[in-house]
Structures are given as structure tokens and as C-alpha cells.
Curated annotation (Swiss-Prot):
UniProt KW keywords: Membrane, Transmembrane, Transmembrane helix, Transport
A Pfam family it matches: TauE
Protein source organism: Arabidopsis thaliana
Localization per record: Membrane
Name of this protein: Sulfite exporter TauE/SafE family protein 4
InterPro entries linked: TM_pro_TauE-like
Keyword Transmembrane among record annotations: yes
TM region positions: 10-30, 50-70, 75-95, 99-120, 131-151, 152-172, 240-260, 266-286, 315-335, 338-358, 381-401, 416-436
Main localisation: membrane
Topology term for the membrane: Multi-pass membrane protein
Length: 459
């Protein structure tokens, strides 16, 4: 039940801390050997918008196929797919990096929105509760939104090679962790299926067979419900209202901040205001979970407070808040929705794959749409291309959820979702890694500045 109940989690966190620390501290050495003036001149040309025309070609066909598969697999795993979209948009279609990140957010928004619409029409696989965990959404969403704003700011300060290294470190770690989690689940499912087969053989035509089948049935409804009844049961208006309010608050701050001179006093005030807003909502939900968990322990109740199976102690709550913040920062640096951290984290705290996928895409819908509105106001992406790729992502997100649910129902192995999640993160690590290394090598050959940049001077 505890978050630190195994060596795996502690070892994974230690790996991230050591690797991140080495990478960040190495900037001071690398930065001393390069020329900041040369970098400033080259960065000016790198910021030029490159928007290819939307016309039929083999590149568009290939990009459409990759976008469809990336969106389908990304929503199934609850990670979005930004690590696949950005390289596809830059290498195949020829967009500049900033425009690619903006269009990537549009695609994630479309895929996650269609995925959420599909999921609200699906019942929870084992309980009579919403498949979207609103408690976890309220816990992670404000920190994720805060992290995205911080990540966007850090993307201006951090050198490109450092962002590449940090992303590879994180993606390799989360992908490996998720893969081993999937193997564990696969073994457990195999044991359960073998036990069921053995008990069926011993209890043919008996009442016990029905009881066993009912106990294992995580994928079929216990009683018939209409689609409207399922939608109503999956929508909690109070939780939705809070989530939308937080989203609107951050959106308003971003809109006002974009109209103000960078690094002015008002700019920094608005930037700092985001912290108490996010921490207030996070603190409200954290105290709610902590109090409920304490009452549960005092009463001797063994039922979990929400979908997570961990004990909601101050340490675990702080850990989840930091992970949400890190997920947002990664989303801001990479141009993804933050699901590369949130998806694996939900599995780590004991959320079953179906609910983890649904909840992660639900939270990503808010984070990605916030960025899309901001990018639209900044005119960061061409509308025709964005609308086309959003349409592809919407179809892919819906199809991906439908296909994987049927596959899981047939095979009775929810671990498939975990393997898809791991595969998408691994593919993202490879594509982002190759592109990042190639670009970093070019920067070294051109003797460009490889250290930290000034935030105000780089705007």
C-alpha cells in the first residue's frame, strides 16, 4: 500500500536525481568552452518561422500515418505522443522547432479530447464509480499546469543539448519502469487465468464457476446501463467545475502575461501568482485525501480512498505534487502534455491501466488546451495545418481507445495498455534523442554557446 514499498521506486528516484544533477552541473563546464555571442547570432536565425504549405504529397501522407498511429498509441497509454509528433513535424513536414511544438500541443489536445469523450461513455471495469478519477485529476492538474509555465520559461534558459539529455534520462527511466511493471502485471494475469482454468476443471457445471467468473470479470458490465446513464455516472460536476476554474485562471494569467513586456515588474508578479493558485488547489485536494485516509485507518476500513492503492501520507502527497510539477516542466520543455510522467506515475501508485489511461488523458486535455489557446494568441502555428492534424488526432484517439478496449476484453490482459505506454515513451526517447544529438553536434561544430542563457536577454 505504501509508495516506497519496494526497492524499484526508491532506485528509480535515485537514478533520476543523480543523472539530472550530473547533467545540470556539467553545463558550467561546457558553457565555459563556447562563445555566447555566436550562439546569440545563430539563435536569432533559428527563431524564424518555417510554415510549409498544406498540399498533398508523400510527406503529408507519411506524416498523417505517423500522426494517426502516434495519437492512437499515445492516448491509449495516456502519454499524448508529443515526443513522436515534434520530430515528425520538423523532419518530415519541415516546420521549425517552436511551430512544431505548438502544433504538437494541438494534436495532443485533439487526441485527448476524443479519448475523454470515448471514456465518459465507458463504465469502470471493476467498480460502480467513474472511470475518471477526479480526486487524482484535482491533485495533479494544478501542479501540471504550473509545471508547464515553468517549463516554457526554462526552455528559454536551458541549452538545447541539456534539454535533450534530461529528456533521454527521464524517458529511458520511465519507459523501463513501465515495461517491467507491464511484465509483472502480465505474470499476475497469467497466474489468475491459470487458477481460473484449474478451478473450472474442478467445478464443472457448478455454482462456483459462475462466482469465479464474476470475480475476475474486470471488463464486462455487471448490469445493463444505457449510454446516457454511464455518461451521467462518469461526470462529477463539482470536480469538473473546479478543474475548469483552475484552467480558466491559468489561461487568464497567460493571456495577460503575453501582453506585458517580458521581465517587467508586472510580468514577474503574474508569474509568481501562479504558484499560490496551483498550491491552493493542490493543498485543498491533498488535505482532503489525507483526512479521508486517516479516517479510513481509524475505522479499520480497507477500501482505498480513490483509485490509487497507496497510503496518503504527507510524504506521498508531496511526492505526487513534485511529480506533477516535473511532468508539467517536461511538457513545457518538450511541447507535450506532461503525460510522459503522469501516465507511469498513476500506474506506480496502483491505479489500474484502464483508469490510469483515462485519467491521464483527462488531465492532459486541460494542460494541452491551455497551451493551444496561448499559442493561438501568439500566432505560433498555421491554422489549416493545425486543423487538419487535429482532425487526424481526434479520429485516432477515438479509434485507439475503441481498439485497445476490445483487445483487452478479448485477451483479458490490461497489461497491454502498460506495454503500449512503455513503447510510446521508448519511441519518443529514440526520436528525440537522435534529433537532439544531431543538433547538438552541429552546435559544437559551429562553436555555439552551450551554457545557460539569460531569460530576459533571450526573449
Amino acid at each position: 500500500m505504501g509508495l516506497w514499498n519496494g526497492k524499484g521506486t526508491g532506485g528509480f528516484i535515485l537514478y533520476l536525481l543523480v543523472a539530472f544533477s550530473v547533467a545540470v552541473f556539467s553545463v558550467s563546464y561546457v558553457g565555459d568552452t563556447t562563445n555566447p555571442i555566436h550562439h546569440h547570432l545563430s539563435s536569432l536565425s533559428a527563431t524564424e518561422k518555417i510554415w510549409p504549405d498544406l498540399k498533398f504529397s508523400w510527406k503529408l501522407v507519411l506524416a498523417t500515418v505517423i500522426a494517426f498511429l502516434g495519437s492512437a498509441c499515445g492516448t491509449v497509454g495516456g502519454v499524448g505522443g508529443g515526443g513522436i509528433f515534434v520530430p515528425m513535424l520538423t523532419l518530415i513536414l519541415g516546420f521549425d522547432t517552436k511551430s512544431a511544438a505548438a502544433i504538437s500541443k494541438c494534436m495532443i489536445m485533439g487526441a485527448s479530447a476524443s479519448s475523454v469523450w470515448y471514456n465518459v461513455r465507458v463504465r469502470h471495469p471493476t467498480k460502480e464509480v467513474p472511470i475518471l478519477d477526479y480526486d487524482l485529476a484535482l491533485l495533479f492538474q494544478p501542479m501540471l499546469l504550473l509545471g508547464i509555465t515553468v517549463g516554457v520559461s526554462l526552455s528559454v534558459v536551458f541549452p538545447y543539448w541539456l534539454i535533450t539529455v534530461l529528456i533521454i534520462i527521464l524517458f529511458v527511466g520511465t519507459s523501463s519502469r513501465s515495461f517491467f511493471k507491464g511484465i509483472e502485471m502480465w505474470k499476475e494475469e497469467t497466474l489468475l487465468k491459470n487458477e481460473m482454468a484449474q478451478q473450472r476443471a474442478n467445478m464443472v457445471n457448478s455454482r462456483g464457476e459462475l462466482l469465479i467468473d464474476t470475480e475476475y470479470e474486470p471488463l464486462y458490465p455487471r448490469e445493463e446501463k444505457s449510454e446516457l446513464e454511464i455518461i451521467r455516472s462518469n461526470l462529477k460536476w463539482k470536480g469538473l467545475l473546479i478543474l475548469v476554474t483552475v484552467w480558466l485562471t491559468f489561461l487568464l494569467i497567460q493571456i495577460v502575461k503575453n501582453e506585458i513586456k517580458v521581465c517587467s515588474t508586472i510580468y514577474w508578479i503574474l508569474f509568481i501568482v501562479q504558484f499560490p493558485v496551483a498550491l491552493a488547489v493542490f493543498g485543498f485536494e491533498a488535505s482532503k485525501l489525507y483526512t479521508a485516509n486517516k479516517k479510513r485507518l481509524n475505522s479499520g476500513n480497507t477500501e482505498c480512498i480513490c483509485e490509487a492503492t497507496i497510503e496518503w501520507t504527507p510524504l506521498s502527497l508531496i511526492f505526487c505534487g513534485l511529480c506533477g510539477l516535473i511532468g508539467g516542466i517536461v511538457g513545457g520543455l518538450l511541447g507535450s502534455g506532461g503525460g510522459f510522467v503522469l501516465g507511469p506515475l498513476l500506474l506506480e501508485i496502483g491505479v489500474i491501466p484502464q483508469v490510469a489511461s483515462a485519467t491521464a488523458t483527462f488531465v492532459m486535455m486541460f494542460s494541452s488546451s491551455l497551451s493551444v489557446v496561448e499559442f493561438y494568441l501568439l500566432k505560433r502555428f498555421p491554422i489549416p495545418y493545425a486543423m487538419y492534424l487535429i482532425s487526424v488526432s481526434i479520429l485516432a484517439g477515438f479509434w485507439g481507445q475503441s481498439f485497445i478496449r476490445k483487445l483487452v476484453a478479448i485477451l483479458r490482459r490490461a497489461s497491454i495498455i502498460v506495454f503500449v505506454l512503455s513503447g510510446v515513451i521508448c519511441a519518443s526517447a529514440l526520436t528525440m534523442g537522435v534529433i537532439g544529438i544531431e543538433k547538438s553536434i552541429k552546435m559544437i561544430h559551429n562553436h555555439e554557446f552551450m551554457g545557460f542563457l539569460g531569460f530576459c536577454s533571450s526573449q
